[in-house]
């Protein structure tokens, strides 16, 4: 019996290979992780394992708990879930906590790796009943893969073509009911048909200072490092309202404290560590300040197109739009206008530049944003 291999929507007999190795090659696929594991986490012990352990996003958590409890009572599969929001706000954490609440495992996939339907078929056909499939950066899957997911999400089935040429025939493959969790930093790039197939859609917003401080205090205990309340607050202030950044800066301050300050994080130690890392009082790092410097000094405060800023900084627009601009916008340091990006008076002041007394429509741009 010849081996079977996936080729897009086609499943055809594998032709014998003129090599010493067998023609039956194992099918490659993304590894499956339990609900308490995550391949992207440098320090998994900082990641909450259950929804009740999470800090912040209380409205989102409450709605998810209701949906999970209802699905358990009905003995039914949980509806598909879409998370959107800036990076580092907990989309992957939700994707690990939800399976734990359901008592199932989760398989992690990344949108950019799904080049064709054949890349998705092994994962779909190997899912256990009610298992969770998580696709990160789901906005980056190609149209062919997206359309292939429609029947899988709605009817839990996929169409396969067996054989080749005139001998080809369509086979309707029934999938076990599963929950798809998608995560995106660009919800606007999702097509309407795909977006509408998610029964639950949640937007994750930036965290409050109190929530971020609580996260830092909790995680300092997990890292077995002593920290004062003032130091925890200072780290939170400089963490851009983002838990992932807060955890990264906590780790750096911990390393600094253990190396230079007898292993205790005080406000003085936190300030010294963050200043050494070039994190300023607003939480802006070198890249953020370079963006503002480019916009203010090189582009005279704007309005300037994102492509011009990216080219001047020798970086890609996606990085600026996904990782830099969301916090600058929230901090009222820049504006997005129809004519381009504009630096606000607050940005001029923070970067120690004199704001223009009058410019090319500056006042009008500020009034009409």
Functional labels for PLM-detected ranges:
Residues 190-222, 229-237, 248:
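Conserved AAA+ ATPase core "coupling" helix
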Residues 298-369:
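Terminal-proximal interaction/regulatory segments of ATP-powered molecular machines
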């Amino acid at each position: 019996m010849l081996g079977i291999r996936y080729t897009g929507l086609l499943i055809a007999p594998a032709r014998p290979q003129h090599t010493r190795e067998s023609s039956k090659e194992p099918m490659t696929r993304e590894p499956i992780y339990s609900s308490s594991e995550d391949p992207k986490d440098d320090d998994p012990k900082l990641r909450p394992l259950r929804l009740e352990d999470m800090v912040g996003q209380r409205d989102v958590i409450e709605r998810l708990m209701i949906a999970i409890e209802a699905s358990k009572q009905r003995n039914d599969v949980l509806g598909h879930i879409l998370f959107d929001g800036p990076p580092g706000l907990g989309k992957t954490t939700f994707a690990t906590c939800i399976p734990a609440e359901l008592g199932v495992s989760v398989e992690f996939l990344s949108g950019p790796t799904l080049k064709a339907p054949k890349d998705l078929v092994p994962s779909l056909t190997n899912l256990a009943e009610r298992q969770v499939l998580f696709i990160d950066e789901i906005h980056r899957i190609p149209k062919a893969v997206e359309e292939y997911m429609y029947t899988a999400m709605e009817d839990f089935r996929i169409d396969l073509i067996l054989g080749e040429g005139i001998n080809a025939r369509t086979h309707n493959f029934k999938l076990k009911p599963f929950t798809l969790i998608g995560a995106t930093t660009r919800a606007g790039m999702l097509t309407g048909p795909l977006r509408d197939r998610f029964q639950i859609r949640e937007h994750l917003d930036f965290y409050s200072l109190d929530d971020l401080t609580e996260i830092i205090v909790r995680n300092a205990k997990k890292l077995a490092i002593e920290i004062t309340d003032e130091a925890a607050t200072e780290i939170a202030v400089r963490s851009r309202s983002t838990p992932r950044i807060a955890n990264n800066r906590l780790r750096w301050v911990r390393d600094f404290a253990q190396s230079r300050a007898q292993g205790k994080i005080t406000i003085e130690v936190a300030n010294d560590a963050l200043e050494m890392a070039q994190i300023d009082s607003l939480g802006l790092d070198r890249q953020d300040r370079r963006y503002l410097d480019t916009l203010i000094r090189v582009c005279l405060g704007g309005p300037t197109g994102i492509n011009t800023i990216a080219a001047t900084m020798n970086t890609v627009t996606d990085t600026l739009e996904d990782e830099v601009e969301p916090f600058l916008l929230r901090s009222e340091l820049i504006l997005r206008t129809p004519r381009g990006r504009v630096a606000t008076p607050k940005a001029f002041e923070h970067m120690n530049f004199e704001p223009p007394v009058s410019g090319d429509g500056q006042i009008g741009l500020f009034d009409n944003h």
